[in-house]
């Protein structure tokens, strides 16, 4: 029997790294819990998220949607569709808050796209065929560097989602570039204004890069 291996690469400046053996990570360690704690910039008003969780626990269908750039698409993840942060967090939500197979997943990540295009893609890639997501994660903290509006398009996308008739929850995710840079200082005021949950990968992982084993590195 023949065996074929297929590996996908994104044509946006990213290359998938070689596969490495996963090291054991103690998710109850002080270091790990500290990293997770640093990632939460703001809890915000949890009402809409709580409603989605209650809906899922009641056995009703809940949809999680993710829109962003190549990081949301899965750049660097192997396999790209099941090891990306979007799918992993969807799985975690499903395992924690679902008593049956009632949680659905939409991934609308496209490499190299800013929130200016995200405003258009949201209709095409998320709301397609009458979809009504209950939670929407927005990730453009790397791709919006060239945004001439300096955050106006980003806020417009956030407002567009918040104003949907069924009132989905919105989570702002601030990913980080390879040189420890992102745009969370520009975009965070949007989350402050609308009292939204905000998660910073920059705050969570960059302190780890200078640590050695035995110094709290995870």
Region annotations inferred by a language model:
Residues 8-14, 57-60, 83-218:
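Alpha-helical cap/lid subdomain in secreted, periplasmic
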Residues 1-67, 72-80, 91, 95-102, ...:
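N-terminal secretory targeting modules
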């Amino acid at each position: 029997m023949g065996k074929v291996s297929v590996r996908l690469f994104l044509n946006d400046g990213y290359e998938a790294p070689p596969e490495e053996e996963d090291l054991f990570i103690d998710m109850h360690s002080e270091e790990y819990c500290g990293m997770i704690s640093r990632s939460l910039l703001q809890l915000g008003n949890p009402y809409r998220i709580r409603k989605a969780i209650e809906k899922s626990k009641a056995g009703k269908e809940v949809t999680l949607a993710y829109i962003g750039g190549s990081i949301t698409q899965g750049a660097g993840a192997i396999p790209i569709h099941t090891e990306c942060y979007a799918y992993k967090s969807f799985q975690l939500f499903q395992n924690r808050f679902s008593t049956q197979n009632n949680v659905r997943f939409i991934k609308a990540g496209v490499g190299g796209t800013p929130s200016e295009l995200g405003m258009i893609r949201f209709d095409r890639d998320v709301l397609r065929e009458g979809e009504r997501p209950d939670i929407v994660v927005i990730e453009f903290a790397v791709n919006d560097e060239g945004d001439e509006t300096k955050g106006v398009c980003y806020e417009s996308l956030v407002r567009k989602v918040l104003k949907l008739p069924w009132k989905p929850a919105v989570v702002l995710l601030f990913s980080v570039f390879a040189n420890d840079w992102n745009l969370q200082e520009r975009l965070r005021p949007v989350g402050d204004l609308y009292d939204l949950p905000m998660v910073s990968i920059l705050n969570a992982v960059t302190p780890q890069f200078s640590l050695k084993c035995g110094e709290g590195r995870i």
